[in-house]
Amino acid sequence: WMSEDLVGAGVEALTELADQIGKPDAIITDPFLTAAALAAERIGAPLVVSGWCATRELDEDALYYVQKVLARESIERMERLYERFGLTGVNFASGATPSILSPHLHLSYFNAEWYQADADNLLPQTLFVGGTPDQPADAPPAWLTQIPPDAPIALITFGTTFAGDIGWFAGAAQAAARAGLIPVVVIGWTTYSPEDKDALKAALPKTTRLLNWVSFPHILPRTRLIIHHGGMGTTHAALVYGVPQLIIPYAADQQGQARRAAQ
């Protein structure tokens, strides 16, 4: 999300689109789409950040060495992009890390209680809108209807980025089975070699359902436990459906989700 070539191309494309259809009333963006934040300033449109709180700037002294190195590299890249497009960076934090920070509005799909330990770092442009369970729009899949309605299910997923850890899936499924739960293991669309796929199947309990994807509205109402990586979307879904979570974080904001779930 900080590739100067790709970000620059994105800014140009969004600017051209605004020229064609007119300046939008606002640009609503993912918290990591640098091009959208730059383009919003360039065309003079307010930026709304979707799915991320507005927080105070990080203190460089609190960063690890490798974080400081990456932060300096990020600042240098952003300064070159500002100069290229004649911008000042109104939609970015000016501290140690140049994260996207709208002065107008950040929408969080959690609530203030979820961020109670971080309350002192939240900025007033954060609006908590919470969330509600979605109702299924279609019939449940056949594999799910074949599981008895009173059978306890453990949903096991590592999202889309970290889905290649075969040992993790096997260990979680074995633990769930020993606890009397039926493991539903969701591995995403990660490409496994035939050997790795066979090894995974051999390591799973015989009661396991192994899938690429599941519909949360169908499976979560029947789930007794979800074991996952702490991704924001998975964590949020488990919360709104009231499913107990066992979180094993890997990277990014996952440590924070695990900490908040424990609190």
Where would I find each of the regions flagged by the language model?
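A donor-sugar binding/catalytic signature common to diverse glycosyltransferases
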Residues: 26-29, 211-260
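Catalytic donor nucleotide-activated moiety binding site of glycosyltransferases and closely related
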Residues: 171-209
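Short Asp/Glu-rich motifs
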Residues: 59-60, 195-196, 239, 257-258
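Residues in the short beta-alpha loop(s) of Rossmann-like NAD(P)-binding domains
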Residues: 53, 189-190, 251
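Short, hinge-like loop/turn segments at secondary-structure boundaries
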Residues: 65-68, 201-205, 246, 263
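Nucleotide-sugar-dependent glycosyltransferase catalytic domains
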Residues: 1-153, 158-182, 195
